[in-house]
C-alpha cells in the first residue's frame, strides 16, 4: 500500500493526479447540487441557470452538461438555456461554436426526461 504521494512511482504520478482531480470534481458537484437545492430568495431554476452561466464562463464541459440537466430538471426551457449560453459567449468570450454544440447536445439528451 502507498502511504504517501512521494512513494508513487514517477511514471504513475500523472495518473494519480488525474484520479485525485476527478474525485475532487465529483465531490464538488455533489456539494454544489446540495447548495443549489436549498431554499432561498432565488428560485431553483434561476440558481441552476446562474450555475450554468458560471460553468460556461469557466469552460468546464462536464459541469456545463450537469448544469443543463439540472436547469431542465427545475423547469428551464431550451430558450432560457440558450439565452444563458449567449450571455456567457458575450461576457466570458468562450469558444462559441464548441460550447453551443455541447449545450445543444445536452439539451437534446435530456429533453425527453424533462
Task: List each language-model region with its residue ranges.
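Mid-chain, well-packed structural core segment of small domains
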Residues: 58-85
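C-terminal structural segments of small proteins and small subunits
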Residues: 82-107
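Short, surface-exposed loop and linker segments with low hydrophobicity and enrichment for Pro/Ser/Thr
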Residues: 45-48, 80
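Residues at alpha-helix boundaries and short interhelical turns
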Residues: 40, 57-61, 75, 93-96
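Acidic, glycine/proline-rich low-complexity segments that act as flexible tails and inter-domain linkers
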Residues: 1-46, 99-114
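Amphipathic, charged-and-aliphatic alpha-helical interface segments
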Residues: 47-61
Amino acid at each position: 500500500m502507498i502511504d504517501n504521494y512521494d512513494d508513487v512511482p514517477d511514471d504513475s504520478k500523472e495518473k494519480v493526479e488525474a484520479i485525485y482531480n476527478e474525485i475532487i470534481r465529483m465531490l464538488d458537484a455533489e456539494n454544489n447540487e446540495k447548495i443549489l437545492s436549498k431554499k432561498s430568495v432565488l428560485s431553483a431554476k434561476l440558481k441552476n441557470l446562474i450555475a450554468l452561466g458560471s460553468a460556461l464562463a469557466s469552460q468546464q464541459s462536464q459541469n456545463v452538461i450537469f448544469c443543463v440537466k439540472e436547469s431542465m430538471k427545475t423547469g428551464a426551457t431550451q430558450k432560457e438555456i440558450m439565452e444563458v449560453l449567449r450571455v456567457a459567449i458575450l461576457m466570458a468570450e468562450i469558444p462559441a461554436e464548441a460550447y453551443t454544440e455541447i449545450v445543444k447536445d445536452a439539451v437534446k439528451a435530456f429533453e425527453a426526461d424533462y
